[in-house]
Curated annotation (Swiss-Prot):
Species whose genome carries this gene: Gallus gallus
EC number assigned by the record: 1.14.13.-
Top EC class of this enzyme: oxidoreductase
Protein name: Cytochrome P450 26A1
Residues involved in heme binding: 437
Any single GO CC term annotated in Swiss-Prot or TrEMBL for this entry: endoplasmic reticulum membrane
Factors inducing expression: By retinoic acid.
């Protein structure tokens, strides 16, 4: 074979497929750009749409924060992309986010990716709209009133204290993140769904925790339900969770009065169904309960793990927490216990600022999803009707001019008379607007109790130093945060 024939063969083998691939990508970009609203004079935001059909989903899933930071550096505070099968505009910055969050029902409406809607189900709060969402949220909010939270305080304190005692006997290395997840799961099962202590065996509890991990790993995936796909695995894990929750619902139906002296969120939903004409069937109750468990333990586990990491790296901050506890009479000796209540917790201003600073630097949920109800004009660009909109929590915190020395862990920034979260949309760990997190007050109380018990019973060392954090979809440490825990003497 002559040289020219070899060159021609090589061109056909390598160059032609490459040209076809580049042409397909270009045609895909043009196809996506054809979704632009011609009646609006503004251009689409800058950005790329990735591969045909797949868009940039695979890049985002594999690289997460690195991918998002690269996009922000290249395109700024608003850019277009293609994620989870939909053309999408990602926005950040207080003003841009304010426009989205205050436009609920008028400019935008909630719409999670198809895989999330399929796995969590149409009956959960985050997938409801308008009046239906308003009424359901009002019912669930009863489970997070101040009186309800007061009932939860001793339950949370009991679980946290027992867990920390086990950590102190765990030896030279304990993987913090899996242990915190199990703790938060037990608390959520008791408080939100009304499971009683020891209702589930350790093996049964571990099976549920693993099922939740599998479901959440595959929550954001391509909407393809075939064996071994992410959506298939997520649905299979969800069905395990639903089976256990159905047992609990049927047990509740057989009882006349709630156990534990308070009504959990699931009990309130069931009573609302029976008394107000909103007929939730068993599937909808299971979906609502699954959503409560997801919101009630995954996000708090992420935040509590970040708290341990930041306090382990900043011993001066931990000492300030202990000094505040000492001033309030909450720093006891190793053999004494001080029962907490809402009044005590509300007095712990610095501890609250430590939690705020943790949520600023490491918000558990990176953002929220909306869909444009009509073509929007935002920051000199158009967002066409029907396109998805993602508002970024983590990026908004990162770029907020309000925060000085943004990368520094400094809880004192929130202690001043004009705290650095005074701008409403610069600090949004719980989202905002009509769709803000329904359980945010529960999360704050839980994290405060966890911080108090941790500070007055434990000292610890992070064995791998500062952790590398990853989003998947909740923020977590890649190495599971190995640490060594020892008892705190009670002396500052």
């Amino acid at each position: 074979m002559g040289f020219s024939a070899l060159v021609a063969s090589a061109l056909c083998t390598f160059l032609l497929p490459l040209l076809l691939f580049l042409a397909a990508v270009r045609l895909w970009d043009l196809y996506c750009a054809s979704g632009r609203d011609p009646s609006c004079p503004l251009p689409l935001p800058p950005g790329t749409m990735g591969l045909p059909f797949f868009g940039e989903t695979l890049q985002m899933v594999l690289q997460r924060r690195k991918f998002l930071q690269m996009k922000r550096r290249k395109y700024g505070f608003i850019y277009k992309t293609h994620l989870f099968g939909r053309p999408t505009v990602r926005v950040m910055g207080a003003e841009n986010v304010r426009h989205i969050l205050l436009g609920e029902h008028r400019l935008v409406s909630v719409q999670w990716p198809a895989s999330v809607r399929t796995i969590l189900g149409s009956g959960c709060l985050s997938n409801l709209h308008n009046g239906q969402h308003k009424h359901r949220k009002k019912v669930i909010m009863q489970a997070f009133s101040r009186d309800a939270l007061q009932h939860y305080v001793p339950v949370i304190q009991e679980e946290v204290s027992a867990c920390l005692a086990q950590w102190l006997g765990a030896g030279p290395c304990l993987l913090v993140y899996p242990e915190v997840k199990r703790l938060m799961f037990r608390i959520a099962m008791r408080i939100l769904l009304g499971f009683q202590p020891r209702q589930a065996s350790p093996d049964g509890e571990q099976q549920l925790v693993e099922a939740f991990e599998e479901m959440i790993r595959n929550l954001f995936s391509l909407p393809i339900d075939v064996p071994f796909s992410g959506l298939y695995r997520g649905l299979r894990a969800r069905n395990i969770i639903h089976a256990k929750i159905e047992e609990n619902i049927r047990a509740k139906m057989a009882r006349k009065e709630p156990e534990g002296g308070y009504k959990d969120a699931l009990q309130l939903l069931m009573e609302h169904t029976q008394g107000n004409g909103e007929q939730l069937n068993m599937q909808e109750l299971k979906e609502s309960a699954t959503e409560l468990l997801f919101g009630g333990h995954e996000t708090t586990a992420s935040a509590a793990t970040s708290l341990i990491a930041f306090l382990g790296l900043h011993h001066d901050v931990l000492q300030k927490v202990r000094k505040e506890l000492q001033l309030k009479g909450l720093l006891s000796g190793p053999n004494q216990e001080k029962q907490l209540n809402m009044e005590f917790l509300e007095q712990l201003k610095y501890t609250g600022c430590v939690i705020k600073e943790t949520l600023r630097l490491s918000p558990p949920v990176p953002g929220g999803f909306r869909i444009a109800l009509k073509t929007l004009e935002l920051n000199g660009y158009q967002i066409p009707k029907g396109w998805n909109v993602i508002y970024s929590i983590c990026d908004t915190h990162d770029v907020a001019d309000l925060f000085t020395d943004k990368d520094e862990f400094n809880p004192d920034r929130f202690m001043s008379p004009s705290p650095e979260d005074s701008s409403r949309f610069s600090f949004i760990p719980f989202g905002g607007g009509l769709r803000s997190c329904v359980g945010k007050e529960f999360a704050k109380v839980l994290l405060k109790i966890f911080t108090v018990e941790l500070a007055r019973s434990c000292d610890w060392q992070l064995l791998n130093g500062p952790p590398t954090m990853k989003t998947g979809p909740i923020v977590y440490p890649v190495d599971n945060l190995p640490a060594k825990f020892i008892g705190f003497s009670g002396q500052i």
